[in-house]
Amino acid sequence: NVRENLTLPLLLDGRNVNKNQLEQLAQILGIQDRMNHLPHQLSGGQQQRVSIGRALITSPALLLADEPTGNLDSKNSAEVMALLRYFHEKKGQTLLVITHDERIACQADRLITVEDGHIAQDEAVRP
């Protein structure tokens, strides 16, 4: 279920689950009412939020997001990017997003374009 999915990284690392932290994360992700649901009972956007939560439960300094909105509609894409921005801005986590979607790329502070395995462009997008 969602609860087990979110806490798996902590358990694999031999760390205790802080129930308050888990509840707060679920609230921020908007999945607090889905904690006992199985993956097939979740929408694509909810599944993506669970994946993000699983990546964030250990409070990493760096979050690597490879195509985080790849299979989502525009509404869910915007919600996922808002969640990632929240954790970047409020929790101070560095976010590295890999995407082919220009709408997602232009939301970055810095944009690095890679072509044929080489950096073709490196620019600040937002101050």
Language model: regions and residue ranges:
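ABC family nucleotide-binding domain
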Residues: 2-107, 111-113
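H-loop (His-switch) and adjacent beta-strand-loop-beta switch element
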Residues: 111-123
